[in-house]
């Protein structure tokens, strides 16, 4: 079983842009699509507001990519690939909407303290 520090590290991913600038992002969730035979990761800038149904006008930057879970030790250690197909984007959007609307799919920080 992973220790608390390892679990915390697995909740974040660092992206490096073309200029070498690093940005920290919090992983919302990952999922696999049988239809596209790919795994996906969705994340938001670390420290940004939580996604809630109660505030429909809330704008939160969310990025989504596909990744190969076998290419690294975890999703935080694998290459990310852009989603370029509109149908694939629609599928990812549907999964995200389900995630936002279903409280049981999200974890709160208070649950992490156990």
From Swiss-Prot:
Record HAMAP family: UPF0473
What family classification does the UniProt entry report for this protein? Belongs to the UPF0473 family.
Q: What is the lineage of its organism?
A: Bacteria, Bacillati, Bacillota, Bacilli, Lactobacillales
What's the name of the protein? Answer: UPF0473 protein OEOE_1164
The record's annotation in InterPro entries points to: UPF0473
> Which species does the entry assign this protein to?
Oenococcus oeni (strain ATCC BAA-331 / PSU-1)
Superkingdom per UniProt: Bacteria
The record's listing under Pfam families reads: DUF1292
